[in-house]
Amino acid sequence: MSSESSREENVYMAKLAEQAERYEEMVEFMEKVAKMTDTEELSVEERNLLSVAYKNVIGARRASWRIISSIEQKEESRGNEDHVSTIKEYRGKIETELSKICDGILNLLESHLIPSASTAESKVFYLKMKGDYHRYLAEFKTGAERKEAAENTLLAYKSAQDIALAELAPTHPIRLGLALNFSVFYYEILNSPDRACNLAKQAFDEAISELDTLGEESYKDSTLIMQLLRDNLTLWTSDNAEEGGDEIKEAAAKRESGEEKPQQ
């Protein structure tokens, strides 16, 4: 079998796995495709499939971690030490899985995806992805490991931002998605609500001023992310926003609905 037909076969299998909601296998198929691209970069469709696969695999564990951490806090406040030690052990198991998933995509980004990226769009996409997965590590790591993960997140997002501001339109969905996730990083990880709000507001205002230039292709994607930016701004600036009362929005992986056409 030629490498081209093998690549097509893996892409098709990834699509099947997505439909079946077997995201671990979807990751495996798309990793094979990514490793075939030593010089040639992934197509937009392949890039989006890889993103969706990893976002679903990590998303399930992030949700589990949040639930378990919440239960742990409640048990601690009740003084149930036996339960707390059991929960801590279980949380550790989830954290091991989270670390493994993040390490997998970060290694792939470093070894194949970022070096082979040739367009501004793909460079921003992969650097944003690098920032996202370092941020997911920072969500649960502690001490020096958390500090390192946060620093790596900041470096990746800043590198992506430098290219995005110079090369992509303010209405470009990838530039908007970067602003959304970068602002979430400032708010949640660095505990800098002012920076988070400034970044989100600037991205929103710049996109609004150029909304009439949007083609039909990306109108839906761009306006959806703009709505998420506005939702977060509303949450962050409301005086009576209780912590955890609302969910902070992030850029979803493309094609998560299974119906949406991938952004070109």
Curated annotation (Swiss-Prot):
Function summary: Is associated with a DNA binding complex that binds to the G box, a well-characterized cis-acting DNA regulatory element found in plant genes.
PANTHER family hit by this protein: 14-3-3 PROTEIN
A family per Pfam: 14-3-3
Residue span of region Disordered: 239-264
InterPro entries: 14-3-3 (IPR000308), 14-3-3_CS (IPR023409), 14-3-3_dom_sf (IPR036815), 14-3-3_domain (IPR023410)
UniProt-recorded name of the protein: 14-3-3-like protein
PROSITE patterns (UniProt xref): 1433_1, 1433_2
Position of the signal peptide: none
Skewed-composition ranges (Basic and acidic residues): 246-264
